[in-house]
Amino acid sequence: VRRILPVLIVLLLLPFAAPTRAAAAGTVWHVIRPQESLAYIAGMYDLDPHDLASWNQIPYEAPIQPDGVLRLNPPPAPLPVFSSRIETVSPGMVNWNPAKGCPIIPANLRRVWVTYIDFTGAARDGSVIVRHDVAPRVQRAFETLYRWRFRIMAMAPMRLNMPGETDMSIVTAGYNCRAVAGTKVWSEHAAGTAVDINPLQNPMKRGTFLSPAAGGLYLDRNRRLIGMIHPEGAARAFLWNGFHWGGTWTSLKDYMHFSLTNR
C-alpha cells in the first residue's frame, strides 16, 4: 500500500484541477454524483457535453450513473467493448488443500474474466473466482459497472494488472478459503458466493478494527472519490443481480462486500 498511496493522493486531487477543453496530457476526470447530468458536468468544466460523451464513449442522451467516472479530456485510445468469459479452475489455481475442509471443491468453482477500467482509465482484463452458478450474475454486474464507467483499482492477474504490488488486500476478488475474521465460521468467500470490490476504497469496519488498515481515508462515505461504492451508485450493479451489500449492515460495515446470503 505504501507504494500506491502517493499515486492515490495524486488521483484524488486531479478531479479538482482546472482542465482545458482538450488536455494534451495527463488524466483528468470527474466522479459522478447523484442528480448530475452530462450537461451539468460539462458546464462545471467549460466543456462541450457532446465532447464529454464522445471521450467517454457513452450515448449523449443516456443518463449517467453515480460513482461512474468521466474523463474530461480525449482518451489516448478508445475503450474496447466489454467482454467476458467463464473458465473452469484447477486445484492449483485456488491453492486447494483438502485438509482445510473448504466448503466447496474446485470442480464447482469458475474463473470469470471481465473487462474493467482501472484507476488510470485504461481497460484491462481481470478475473474473479466464484461458485459455478454465481458466475453469470457476476458477469452481468461487471458489465453494468463497465457501462457506467466505474473504475476498479486492480484485479487478478496482478503480475499483469499491477506489476510489483504485493499487498493483495487491495484486490477486487471472490473465492478465498478462509474463515470470517476473528471467528471459526466460514466466510462466504470460502463458498464462492461473495465478491469484494475495491477493498481499499470500501473498507470493512467493526468497532475499532479496520480492513484494509490503510482504508481510513475512505471512512467518510459522504465523500465521492474514485472507486468508492454508494447505495445509489455502483452498489446497484450487484444488488440488481441478487447480491446483498455489507454497506447496509448495522453490526458492522463492510462496504466492499457483496454476497448472495447477506453474510
Regions found by a protein language model. Give the residues of each.
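Second-shell loop/turn segments in exported
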Residues: 29, 37-41, 123-132, 183, ...
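Primarily a LysM-type cell-wall glycan-binding module
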Residues: 22-48, 68
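Surface-exposed patches in mature extracellular/periplasmic domains of secreted proteins
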Residues: 60, 149-160, 186, 245-251
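Catalytic cores and adjacent binding grooves of peptidoglycan-active enzymes
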Residues: 179-186, 191-263
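Positively charged n-region of N-terminal signal peptides that target proteins for export
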Residues: 1-4
